[in-house]
Amino acid sequence: MAELQEVQITEEKPLLPGQTPEAAKTHSVETPYGSVTFTVYGTPKPKRPAILTYHDVGLNYKSCFQPLFQFEDMQEIIQNFVRVHVDAPGMEEGAPVFPLGYQYPSLDQLADMIPCVLQYLNFSTIIGVGVGAGAYILARYALNHPDTVEGLVLINIDPNAKRWMDWAAHKLTGLTSSIPEMILGHLFSQEELSGNSELIQKYRNIITHAPNLDNIELYWNSYNNRRDLNFERGGDITLKCPVMLVVGDQAPHEDAVVECNSKLDPTQTSFLKMADSGGQPQLTQPGKLTEAFKYFLQGMGYMASSCMTRLSRSRTASLTSAASVDGNRSRSRTLSQSSESGTLSSGPPGHTMEVSC
């Protein structure tokens, strides 16, 4: 029987009432593919990368990441890093609708805008955090500029181009569903949509009544026309930095993330499969994701052990080693809930980890 190790799960605590939000500075910069808007929080820290985020289709940086970065325990992280939130063109608040016939950038071109952002800010390296389309964009950027990326947190990434069967299903769905409903099906699981929780109602309202819905459709079309990233384990096309892959259990992109995990270097990759988190774990489980992010950063040498003391709270989990059922995947470890207490030592990624929490 595999030896059990235990790790405590942080209790979920939103930003405390009355806690002053960070000051933000919003900038726009011209690139070869049009203007891009980004918002900077904090000040650069010596010898530390910036945390750069990129949001999914139907969202902007606030609706995608605010619940995560305003979470109380996340403050330990953001005090130590400057943060750059990139909005895809036309997705920023108050963005004008693009004129009819506007050629929206491809996802590859959106990735090629990032060097302009970093040059404008005079930042040399980043830790990228992306969701869905944003995860793809950051992965593409990391392939093109590996020396500038120290780590990646990729939530719901699908590294594959749409295949003809996917296209047929997409076209058929488009005949019977509106753009907002198709995007909601991309963001959330069918179980979540059927449950119609307050979260689903909120995001359905945000997308359905978005004044820039035409722009959102352009971003959606670019995502559906993405190229294959062609990851190959042991090949030349791979991510060179530490990577944490994240997906919710039974989320729309679960299979794609599992496949992506099988193609990346197991010595550099951690795989976090989050139970009870639905399609958007950064919205539904910010506490668990914050904790995982802290361990990821600690493994990279950026979060000292003294910064991790607040992790020892309330709920606990057990870490057990298990062999993968997929021959293409490496030996994995699974994190499951337990009633006993303990700690998990952190270090650089040593092999692929499959984590359910």
From Swiss-Prot:
The keyword NAD does not apply. Pfam families: Ndr. This is Protein NDRG2. Interacts with CTNNB1. Contributes to the regulation of the Wnt signaling pathway. Down-regulates CTNNB1-mediated transcriptional activation of target genes, such as CCND1, and may thereby act as tumor suppressor. May be involved in dendritic cell and neuron differentiation. Keywords: Acetylation, Cell projection, Cytoplasm, Developmental protein, Differentiation, Neurogenesis, Phosphoprotein, Tumor suppressor, Wnt signaling pathway. Residues 333-347 have a biased composition (Low complexity). The modification Phosphothreonine is found at T20, T316, T320, T334, T343. GO terms for cellular component: cytoplasm; growth cone; perinuclear region of cytoplasm. GO terms for biological process: cell differentiation; nervous system development; signal transduction; Wnt signaling pathway.
